[in-house]
Amino acid sequence: AEMAVRASLTGHKVYSTIHTRDPREVYFRLEDMKVEKYLIRDSLVGIVSQRLIRLLCDNCKTIIDEKNIDGKVIKLYEKCGCNECNFTGYKGRSLVAAIHVIDNEMKEKIKNINNDNSLLSNLEMIKNLKALLINGNISLLDYENFIEVEGLSFEFKKESKL
């Protein structure tokens, strides 16, 4: 890990995959790998956090409720099952992602990452997930399960309330 960080500091582009539950853990994982904090801050230029979620089959999804979300009445769907989706209720997947650009301002903020849970959070992923729900691409149950399975902290659950 330290060799990759040092290579990035000499101008080489280094891409790596670190499997973590959220972008904050990337920073802490590099610390656990004995990379100095100042080297982490100086070498990171971005973190992409991504997950896949199953999409409801447009052919058979069923309306179960209507709710007022952000001033708009939206239809909530649940999976059903048909020949087109092989009776699963799902057809295809969508990417739910967040991109964190580590600019000079963020590098300064990262110095206090232990005291600020909002830094490098998955909140952007929740906003993207909410858009899929509002557009009728996923069910409310899948939305809630995603939040639960991803282990998002309480603050982000509050933000995601419908």
List PLM regions with ranges.
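Short, flexible helix-loop junctions that flank or precede catalytic/ligand sites
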Residues: 1-162
